[in-house]
């Protein structure tokens, strides 16, 4: 089914965490409970809908979530446009196999596939709250990052990049950009990526994707998406020292930012901007329409962005059981906070 899944992902421009290479890697290395990749097919047997989900029993209830829950996975159902309504209804009906199940779909994309059908379903009672947003860069009609920066509304960013370029030249920093796209290239630099990530985490603790089981997941996902021809990895070196990396995965007409970190030692050289400029150049060279920067309001993202879309936390349960679902979600959140407190001490 992998070939069909990839084709559907390209047709509907699925986000990076909805891709088979990422889903399979996550389940192999980080998955718990039961994998539930729910599919819908039309009368001819063609794949028309897919939901990459998993189910865990938490505080005594089966809870269904996106694959990649807790790692910034923006989700939606993958639905072929001509059959979207029917496919979404079939998927939501299938998931309502017991009135005890809770859907906890964090970071559901605003307007994302299947959301309207879930809200209108008589099998589910739904609540949603605004959670975050994803900036994006519209590069339609642009031939390069330089052309994008020449737009009248980007004067401050253009001046900032000019200062960075002068500093790189005048200070002879030896800053170099490398682009990696193949599994072999990933294997050759994975230790360098780990060094950058270690240094970034020491300065600001976030979530380390290159340590322990998450390292196994990340490396597996990078290899798999590279083999599928989706990977764009920008590696920044200062002399021989790696100081930054930015991973993007291409789906349809969009390059989605997936993971980026930089070493604070290079902060004065604006590595986030330098790598993003390279990513825009790579995307325009491929004839893509959009660079989706995914979750977060990092300043370097906002300076480049053309717009943004929202994400929602969606909670759903059988009619009459939403209050119980809310209590379940609260208990899960409390248990997670307690576990985090115990881990710190």
Question: Which role does the model predict for each range below?
Answer:
Residues 1-64, 107-134, 138-268:
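A conserved beta-strand-loop-helix scaffold within acyl/acetyltransferase catalytic domains
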Residues 117-146, 232, 288-345:
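Active-site/acyl-donor-binding loops of N-acyltransferases
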Residues 95-113:
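ATP-hydrolysis module of ASCE/P-loop NTPase motor domains
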Residues 69-100:
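A gly/proline- and charged-residue-enriched helix-loop-helix capping module
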């Amino acid at each position: 089914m992998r070939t069909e899944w990839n084709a559907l992902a390209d047709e509907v421009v699925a986000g990076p965490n909805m891709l088979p290479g990422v889903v399979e890697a996550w389940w192999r290395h980080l998955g718990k409970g039961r994998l539930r990749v729910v599919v819908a097919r039309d009368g001819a047997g063609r794949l028309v809908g897919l939901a990459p989900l998993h189910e865990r029993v938490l505080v005594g209830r089966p809870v269904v979530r996106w694959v990649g829950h807790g790692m910034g996975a923006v989700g939606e159902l993958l639905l072929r446009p001509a059959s979207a309504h029917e496919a979404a209804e079939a998927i939501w009906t299938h998931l309502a196999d017991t009135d005890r199940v809770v859907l906890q779909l964090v970071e559901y994309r605003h307007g994302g596939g299947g959301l309207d059908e879930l809200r209108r379903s008589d099998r589910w009672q739904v609540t949603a709250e605004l959670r975050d947003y994803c900036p994006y860069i519209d590069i339609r009609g642009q031939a390069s990052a330089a052309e994008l920066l020449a737009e009248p509304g980007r004067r401050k960013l253009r001046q900032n990049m000019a200062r960075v370029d002068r500093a790189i030249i005048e200070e002879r920093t030896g800053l170099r950009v490398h682009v990696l796209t193949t599994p072999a290239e990933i294997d050759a630099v994975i230790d360098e990526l780990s060094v950058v990530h270690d240094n970034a985490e020491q300065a600001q603790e976030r979530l380390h994707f290159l340590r322990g089981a998450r390292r196994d997941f990340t490396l597996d996902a990078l290899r798999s998406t590279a083999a599928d021809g989706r990977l764009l990895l920008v590696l920044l070196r200062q002399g021989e020292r790696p100081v930054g990396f930015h991973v993007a995965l291409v789906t349809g007409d969009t390059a989605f930012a997936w993971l980026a970190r930089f070493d604070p030692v290079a902060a004065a050289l604006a590595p986030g901007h330098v790598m993003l400029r390279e990513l825009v150049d790579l995307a325009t060279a491929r004839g893509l329409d959009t660079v989706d920067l995914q979750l977060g309001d990092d300043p370097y993202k906002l300076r480049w962005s053309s717009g943004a879309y929202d994400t929602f936390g969606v909670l759903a349960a059988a009619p009459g059981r939403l209050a119980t679902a809310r209590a379940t979600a609260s208990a899960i959140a409390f248990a997670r906070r307690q576990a985090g407190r115990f881990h710190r001490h």
